[in-house]
């Protein structure tokens, strides 16, 4: 039973770190990446649809993205969605494709994005600590029901704390790497 609790906590902590990594791929670092546009929703066929479902997105020349729409009649809608996003990008319509040139980030914008990355890291740490709290509560419930001894419970709580420390260290490394990537000109 304790093994199951520890495995569940570890799985949930790993998922939290993976979610942070995925979330940070959408933060603009000066290099073009199709993941930058993951959060953009386009008004298509009456519903908000993710941009990557109505167009193919590719990197061109390192600092620009090319958006090739599946339905050419949606160019205006996609253009509007890009303007509405907080990415600060200006779309250029060239025939049936949209080009996005990524200008170099200003120092002020880099610091702003760095704060945002740091905040997301803190949110992940809070989620990991909540997972630890839940796991420790499950261990305490087992102890209260006399399903485990005090020594087993204390050992399990120590193991859960070690998992938490490792997960928080991983979050710090992910955030630090992203901040370094942001600050590299």
Curated annotation (Swiss-Prot):
Statement: the UniProt record of this protein carries the keyword Nucleotide-binding: no
Keyword Cytoplasm among UniProt keywords: yes
Short name of one Pfam family: RRF
GO biological process: cytoplasmic translational termination
Gene3D superfamilies: 3.30.1360.40, Ribosome-recycling factor
Listed GO MF terms: ribosomal large subunit binding
Keyword terms: Cytoplasm, Protein biosynthesis
Signal peptide annotation: none
Main location: cytoplasm
InterPro entries linked: Ribosome_recyc_fac, Ribosome_recyc_fac_dom, RRF_sf
Record localization: Cytoplasm
Coiled-coil blocks: none
A cellular component term, taken from the record's GO annotations: cytosol
Role this protein plays: Responsible for the release of ribosomes from messenger RNA at the termination of protein biosynthesis. May increase the efficiency of translation by recycling ribosomes from one round of translation to another.
Family: Belongs to the RRF family.
Protein name: Ribosome-recycling factor
Organism of origin: Xanthomonas oryzae pv. oryzae (strain KACC10331 / KXO85)
Name of the coding gene: frr
């Amino acid at each position: 039973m304790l093994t199951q609790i520890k495995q569940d906590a570890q799985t949930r902590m790993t998922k939290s770190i993976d979610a942070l990594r995925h979330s940070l791929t959408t933060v603009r670092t000066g290099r073009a990446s199709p993941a930058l546009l993951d959060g953009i929703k386009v008004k298509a066929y009456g519903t908000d649809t993710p941009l990557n479902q109505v167009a193919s997105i590719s990197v061109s020349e390192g600092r620009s993205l090319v958006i090739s729409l599946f339905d050419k009649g949606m160019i205006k809608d996609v253009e509007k969605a890009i303007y509405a996003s907080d990415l600060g990008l200006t779309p250029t319509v060239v025939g049936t494709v949209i080009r996005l040139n990524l200008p170099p980030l200003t120092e002020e914008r880099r610091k702003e994005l760095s704060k945002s990355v740091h905040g997301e890291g803190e949110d992940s740490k809070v989620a990991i600590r909540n997972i630890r709290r839940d796991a420790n509560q499950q261990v305490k419930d087992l102890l209260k029901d006399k399903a485990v001894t005090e020594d087993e419970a204390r050992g399990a709580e120590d193991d859960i704390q070690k998992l938490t420390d490792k997960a928080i260290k991983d979050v710090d490394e992910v955030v630090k790497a992203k901040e370094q990537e942001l600050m590299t000109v």
